[in-house]
Amino acid sequence: VLARKISVEERKLMAKTLAKEFDFKLYTISNTERFPEICNCGPVDFAKQAPLVFNGSKINIYVTPRAIRSGVPLRVLEIMACQGFVLVNYQEDLAKEFEEGKELVMYRSLDEMVEKIRYYLEHEEERQAIARAGYEKVIREYNYAAKLRKILEQRPSGVIQHMRNSF
């Protein structure tokens, strides 16, 4: 519960900061009336509209909830699969899976996030190249066949034989 509250407060601070400096749009069901500087576009139909938002946004920002300590957030993969440029808070597992600055971009503080937004808004070709490389990696390595192959490659010897004998 505490992690969720901290995440909410971090996201509010981020949204308010970005709304003051950039053409920042938020797509959420959350009530933001107390924050008139935030442009809340409301929720989108995930299947129909989210891919258009992810692809059409110059920069998609993802803030990982504090309760999530490991793994690759599904939302990051969804953005990348739509050829969207993603700016996400630093996470060790993301750094292991993706080449920072080549397939996605990570930040470690609100100040660094703002700096990187400024930079990538001014460097469109670089931003598009990162989005394209991220898309290619997700399509190539984050599908069921690739994941199953990776699981089978990492299995202890004898597991497949045990599974065959079990059925």
What would you call each of these model-derived segments?
Residues 69-70, 123:
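Short helix-capping/hinge SLiMs at alpha-helix to coil transitions
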Residues 51, 74-81, 95:
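Short alpha-helical segment that forms part of, or immediately flanks, the ligand-binding pocket
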Residues 114-167:
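C-terminal amphipathic helix plus adjacent low-complexity
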Residues 1-69, 85-87, 91-94:
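Nucleotide-sugar donor-binding catalytic core of glycosyltransferases
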